Regions:
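Left-handed beta-helix
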Residues: 1-162
């Protein structure tokens, strides 16, 4: 799953979403296009409805309605996105708003839907990490998986170098 999705960001992946002979059928969501502010992007796919303020996104997939905060760096990661948008009032009232906060570093990870990742969070998967599981995340085959609807508090460190 992880490698197949990350490969979608390759110049010509094995499963090419732009190949007219390999049609992908989905339902229209009628979302606005992604908005990107000052982000360096390389070999990445961004879905509609996303608002991105990240410093850098490389070799990653960013799903629908994703929010990524300022100065965050993401590498070789699948961000599944969100099922809904939060209002400004909801974001201000939440301890940790929907999406990925500012000043985070995330590498070799899958961030499941509707996850809330606080500010200054460090997540780094590695094949050297043993499989493990907590209420908010698990590590399988070196990939850190943040669970659906999980809340990761500000300053949390997970994985290699934590």
């Amino acid at each position: 799953f992880f490698e197949a999705n990350i490969e979608l960001a390759d110049p010509i992946p094995q499963f090419n979403l732009f190949d007219k002979n390999q049609v992908v059928y989905t339902r229209p969501r009628l979302l606005p296009p992604a908005k990107i502010f000052g982000t360096w992007l390389n070999h990445s796919v961004l879905a509609e409805g996303s608002i991105i303020h990240a410093k850098k996104i490389e070799r990653s997939i960013v799903g629908i309605r994703s929010r990524i905060g300022e100065n965050t760096e993401i590498a070789k990661t699948i961000v599944m996105g969100n099922d809904f948008f939060e209002t400004i009032e909801e974001m201000m009232a939440a301890d940790v708003p929907l999406g990925i906060g500012r000043e985070c570093y995330i590498e070799n990870a899958i961030i499941d839907k509707n996850a809330r990742i606080g500010k200054n969070v460090y997540i780094r998967g590695s094949i050297t990490l043993p499989d493990s599981e907590t209420d908010t995340h698990c590590i399988r085959d070196g990939i850190v998986v943040v669970k659906k609807n999980a809340v990761i508090a500000d300053g949390t460190r997970i994985g290699l170098g934590a």
